[in-house]
Amino acid sequence: MWRIGIDEAGYGPNFGPLVMSAVACQAPSELVEADFWEVLHPAVGRCARRGGHLFVDDSKKVYQPGKGLAGLERTVHAFLSCLSHPGCHTLADLLQCLQTQTSVGPMIDEPWYHGGTTVPAAAAAADIASGSQNLKDALAQAAVCWGPIYSIAIDTPRFNGIVDRHGSKGAALAVAVVQLLRACLAHAPADDGLVIIDKHGGRNFYAPILQELCPDAWVVPIQEGMTSVYEVRWPQRVIRVILRPEADATSFEVALASIVSKYIRELCMEEFNAFWKTHVPHVKATAGYPGDATRFLADIRPTLERMKLPMDRIWRKR
């Protein structure tokens, strides 16, 4: 059976991309609802545990501004090593490796993006190699096959276009979820599965979205509300889909998806800040969140106007 987790990074900021990722693994049926923090221990663990394991947890616990990307990076690159992707040496490589077949080239309209940032950027190669080998050993012992991993980076112009068409920034989440689920289901066309999605925004009813995604299946609502549960039924298989807030606290795959998304977004924000530092040397870097984003916009506005960059190319409308 397949276990799939989906989570995002960057839903709230005014600057930078919204990144959403899906991670999947194929596990024996007796492990479909198992606690993978225990199944894969000691190779992986939460941040509260001591030791040299890979951190898989809420990305806000793994990454703290000012402390660098090493924690995120060790985990992401160790899990990528379990896949058949070619080596990723730059941000552009990473985005290319993880994009779905239907996703548009990432950040093509962002003035600050060049994709040349070297990865890994902070973690030592020896630490990644050690974590990777321990992970592969744990996966083999549990008979778990890891992958695929997909990510979608919705740049500011595309984000604003979605808001204009649908009147809600929550629509951007729906667009990304549909693309990611379509890619994951295509990868596993004949197997049952469990999909857990970290829920954001006020939407409680997802049956129409799932039915549009799977027109040849029967979508059955099991529960709709703060937590929404559906079964997507085909004659040969059933996929159970659960959407709930703070799913990264209880789902290993969702926590890992949050880490992948956060890692990509932080690499993007490094390029964002470097671009504006080149044009406005005195400007202090921003994470892009409301409040500080307003300060940053005020600092760069004169340069923005001289460059004749439209506001909706760098500033999200919602």
Model-flagged regions — what are they?
Residues M1-R318:
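RNase H-like, Mg2+-dependent phosphodiesterase core
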